[in-house]
Amino acid sequence: MTRVKRGNVSRKRHKKILNMSKGFRGAASTLFRTANQQNMKALRYSYRNRRQKKRDFRRMWITRVNSAVRRYGLNYSEFMNYLKTHKIQLNRKVIAQLSICDPEAFMQLLLF
């Protein structure tokens, strides 16, 4: 049986990892072992931060709505309860956008 050498396979694998680690600093973009470790870490961070981003945006929307509502003497939880009891189904993103871009429409929510 002929001897199988895996030079092409390993070169392709190394090249794939090094291409994925372009833009990393120092040895993390040139040496395979460190590039591989940094690449795995970067993928873990990106997975984690895709979920973190959703929490961050929700927190930002709540903060914006809270600050906008406090101008009118309410707080966030009272305002959200008010919307729920009056069957106004707007999500936090839309409410936060209204409070910034269209204060008159936001005021109409309070007067509904």
Curated annotation (Swiss-Prot):
Keywords of this entry: Chloroplast, Plastid, Ribonucleoprotein, Ribosomal protein, RNA-binding, rRNA-binding
Entry annotated with the keyword Plastid: yes
UniProt keyword Amino-acid biosynthesis present: no
Cell compartment(s), UniProt: Plastid, Chloroplast
Entry's Gene Ontology BP terms: ribosomal large subunit assembly; translation
Listed GO MF terms: rRNA binding; structural constituent of ribosome
UniProt-listed Pfam families: Ribosomal_L20
Function: Binds directly to 23S ribosomal RNA and is necessary for the in vitro assembly process of the 50S ribosomal subunit. It is not involved in the protein synthesizing functions of that subunit.
HAMAP family reported for this sequence: Ribosomal_bL20
PANTHER family per UniProt: 39S RIBOSOMAL PROTEIN L20
Protein name, entry field: Large ribosomal subunit protein bL20c
Natural source organism: Chlamydomonas reinhardtii (Chlamydomonas smithii)
Lineage: Eukaryota, Viridiplantae, Chlorophyta, core chlorophytes, Chlorophyceae
Gene behind the chain: rpl20
